[in-house]
Design a protein with these regions (language model features):
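Short beta-strand edge/turn micro-motifs at domain boundaries
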Residues: 81-113
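Homeobox/homeodomain signature
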Residues: 4-5, 18, 44-49, 83, ...
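Core segments of small alpha/beta cavity-forming domains
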Residues: 1-43
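Residue-identity detector for glycine
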Residues: 5, 18, 30-31, 49-50, ...
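Solvent-exposed, non-transmembrane amphipathic alpha-helical segments
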Residues: 27, 31-34, 44, 48, ...
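Primarily hydrophobic membrane-targeting regions of prokaryotic envelope proteins
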Residues: 7-16, 24-27, 66-88, 94
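Surface-exposed, charged secondary-structure patches
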Residues: 40-79
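Solvent-exposed loop/turn segments at secondary-structure junctions
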Residues: 31, 74, 100-103
Length: 114
C-alpha cells in the first residue's frame, strides 16, 4: 500500500492544473470526469497562495482501499483533518469520488461534479 508521502505526491499532481490532464485523470477514480472537480479545488486553493498547507496522513490498508486523513493547516485557524480514501483500480491507487467531493466541499468550498 502507498505511504503518506506517496499519497501526498499523488494528490499534489491531481491538484496541479499545469500537469497533463491524462496524468491527473489516471490518479482519480472518476478519471477525466473527475478532473473538473480537481480543477475547482486547485483554483480555490491557489487563491489562498501559501496560506494553506496540507498533507495526507495515517494511511491504512483496508481491504481494497486505503483510508487516510487529509490534514489542512491554515494560519490562525489551525489544522483540521478530513477522512478520505483511495481505491484500487486496475492495480493503481486512485482517489475515490466521494473523497474528491469531501475535499471540494469541506476543504475548498467548491462544487463537486463526480
Amino acid at each position: 500500500a502507498p505511504n503518506a508521502g506517496e499519497l501526498t505526491a499523488d494528490l499534489r499532481q491531481v491538484l496541479d492544473t499545469g500537469a497533463p490532464s491524462d496524468a491527473r485523470a489516471a490518479k482519480l477514480a472518476g478519471g477525466q470526469a473527475a478532473v473538473p472537480t480537481a480543477d475547482n479545488i486547485a483554483n480555490r486553493l491557489n487563491t489562498y497562495g501559501g496560506m494553506v498547507s496540507w498533507e495526507v496522513q495515517n494511511p491504512v490498508l483496508n481491504g481494497d482501499r486505503v483510508d487516510a486523513q487529509l490534514a489542512v493547516s491554515i494560519p490562525i485557524f489551525g489544522t483540521k483533518t478530513h477522512n478520505i480514501y483511495w481505491v484500487d483500480q486496475d492495480g493503481q491507487w486512485k482517489l475515490s469520488n466521494p473523497s474528491a467531493c469531501v475535499i471540494a466541499h469541506d476543504v475548498a468550498g467548491v462544487d463537486c461534479t463526480v
